[in-house]
Amino acid sequence: VTAVVDMPNTNPFTSDQKTFADKVKIATSKSVVDFGVGINVEPGLVDRPWFDTIPSAFWKLYPYGITSEDYFGLAEQVLSKTKKPLVIHGEHPDFMDDKPLTNLADHTDNRLKAEPECLSRMPPSPYLHIAHLSTFEGFKRKPSLATSEVCPHHLLLNLDICHSINCKVDPPLRTKLDNQGLYKAFKEGQIPILASDHAPHTVDEKESSTPPSGMPGVETMVPL
């Protein structure tokens, strides 16, 4: 692990100067590797007086609880006014279904086209970074100039291997063909970053009837 970045959807949520500064202070006193703290993208962000001056490592845009019009509109706004990375969770809000899950495959079926449809609409920009690529089709459709990353679980795990609903992650686990395509792209340097997408949920949370999405990626990177 060469760098750790704090996503704004952790506790406390990061969308203001004070929370950002508090997290930087804690990380400065404890981190033994490079670190970065991100700020959530939300309406009005680019109009805040500190937008151009706050020393955030990156901006982060999520597709949850937002219309597709607002999601892509915010991406364009930020990219037009920043020289810091805009990190996106690249799933199209219109292609993310919330149907109840009875098994792990349901979660994948609910989002079959979400990543490719999202990335094909994103504008080309060297400041756009696509977090946790999960589909080979999404990789092929990502905009020119954009950077990207992939996680071990999207390189090595798939629905043929994992059946338990406690393997639920966002974006979902995909197919063996997606594993193979992404692994080849990673091996050839077309995807330059291996990321953990660390989500430190407890065993009890993951074994519940409604497990949260995510894997403890820092612990599982080496075993995988």
Predicted segment positions?
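Metal-associated gating/positioning segment near the N- to mid-region
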Residues: V1-K30
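Short helix-capping segments at alpha-helix termini
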Residues: T28-V33, S144
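Active-site beta->alpha loop and helix N-cap motifs at the rims of alpha/beta catalytic domains
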Residues: V37-V46
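Short, conserved beta-strand edge motifs with alternating hydrophobic and charged residues
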Residues: I193-D197, V203
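Gly/Ser/Thr-rich active-site loops/lids in small-molecule metabolic enzymes
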Residues: P211-L224
